[in-house]
Regions:
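NAD(P)H-dependent oxidoreductase Rossmann-fold/reductase module
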Residues: 1-25, 98-99, 229-334
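Glycine-rich phosphate-binding loop and adjoining beta1-alpha1-beta2 segment
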Residues: 65-104, 110
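Gly/Ser/Thr-rich loops at beta-strand to alpha-helix junctions
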Residues: 47-54, 112-114, 139-143, 225-229
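The beta1-alpha1 cofactor-binding region of Rossmann-like NAD(H)/NADP(H)-dependent oxidoreductases
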Residues: 108-120
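A glycine-rich helix->loop->beta "capping" turn
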Residues: 119-148
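Rossmann-fold scaffold of SDR-type NAD(P)-dependent oxidoreductases
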Residues: 46, 131-139, 151, 218-223
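Canonical Rossmann dinucleotide-binding motif of NAD(H)/NADP(H)-dependent dehydrogenases/reductases
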Residues: 35-73, 77
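Catalytic loop of short-chain dehydrogenase/reductase
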Residues: 153-261, 268-291
């Protein structure tokens, strides 16, 4: 079967298994080239199939020889249709991990649901006993709330007033003006429900109650702050409110983990074109200009370079984890 790229809006709807496998291999090779990290040995990655989640899983496995369980929601291949990229990424990761003699299993389903939480906990209990690191890296536009049954949809809108700026179409290279109408209060609530910290806290509570968290466990979620040019639509918009909620949740989770001497952190990562970020107007144009400057300065890093630094220099550096005045780990410091 010959796979041609097919586009829908900003998303390429077809993926190439060999390209995905090569991407995974390149990341593994990078981690191996950087040497061992004295990190966690039993790791759960929620949102493990693309972007920062996939790179976190690769860093744990090939940097620290960790056993990993990955949770994600991806489409397998069907008649005449390739699988989603995350499906191929995860298949390639498992193949490479098993080849290296590492434990790696995955659960494909809705991480927001009670059912997938239970399946994951059963697997941890049966195979690993406990985990000493939980990475939370979900990027989803919708969330069915497991307790209320309400379907929440996140939106990317400014708060209070209309936002206008330039953006770029990646397919044509054309720069155009884009305007986004302000959100309603309901939009803010829905976006917090999908992208805030509630589900992260639910995972940690469930794992703790089932005695599946090891002493001194760490849990990390990912965030982005960005520049003033994207502030109105990003950090001071609906998504920013969700990120504020996520960051506040880290402190609540740290309180929950006190009895285990555990800690929760939010890591602020650098701007990247990922499936998640390319959906945001203005961001593609900002990032394309930013990349040029960072590459000239030698400071550009993909997801794997950032995660290698997070694990080696921040989380598992042999002493205290460096944070800023708000308690955030800053990977966007370079």
């Amino acid at each position: 079967m010959i796979i041609e790229p097919r586009m829908r809006g900003f998303i390429c709807t077809t993926s190439h298994p060999e390209g995905c496998a090569q991407n995974v291999k390149n990341q593994i090779d990078y981690i191996k080239s950087k040497g061992a990290i004295d990190g966690a040995k039993k790791v759960l990655v929620i949102g493990a199939s693309t972007g920062f989640g996939l790179s976190s899983r690769i860093t744990s496995a090939f940097g620290s020889n960790a056993s990993t369980i990955g949770v994600f929601f991806e489409k397998p291949p069907a008649e005449g249709k390739p699988a989603s990229p995350g499906w191929y990424n995860s298949a390639a990761f498992e193949k490479e991990a098993h080849k290296a003699g590492l434990y790696a299993k995955s659960i494909n389903g809705d991480a927001f649901s009670d059912e997938i939480k239970k399946q994951t906990m059963d697997l941890i209990k049966a195979d690993l006993g406990q985990v000493d690191l939980v990475i939370y890296s979900l990027a989803s536009p919708v969330r069915m709330h497991p307790k209320t049954g309400v379907l929440h949809r996140s939106v990317l809108k400014p708060i209070g007033e209309k936002f206008s700026n330039k953006t770029v179409d990646f397919h044509t290279g054309k720069v155009s003006e884009v305007s986004i109408e302000p959100c309603s209060d309901e939009d803010i609530e829905n976006t917090i429900a999908v992208m805030g910290g509630e589900d992260w806290a639910m995972w940690i509570d469930a794992l703790k109650q089932a005695d599946l968290l090891a002493p001194e466990v760490k849990t990390v979620a990912y965030s982005y702050i960005g520049p003033s040019v994207t502030e109105a639509v990003y950090r001071k918009g609906t998504i920013g409110r969700a990120k504020d909620n996520l960051e506040a949740t880290a402190f609540e989770i740290s309180d929950t983990l006190k009895s285990l001497n555990g800690q929760a952190f939010v890591s602020v990562n650098k701007a990247l074109v990922t499936q998640a970020s390319s959906a945001i107007p203005v961001i593609p144009l900002y990032i394309s200009l930013l990349y040029k400057t960072m590459k000239e300065e030698g400071t550009h890093e993909g997801t794997i370079e950032q995660m290698q630094r997070l694990f080696a220099e921040k989380l598992y550096n042999g002493s205290e984890i460096p944070v800023d005045e708000k308690g955030l780990i800053r990977i966007d410091d370079l």
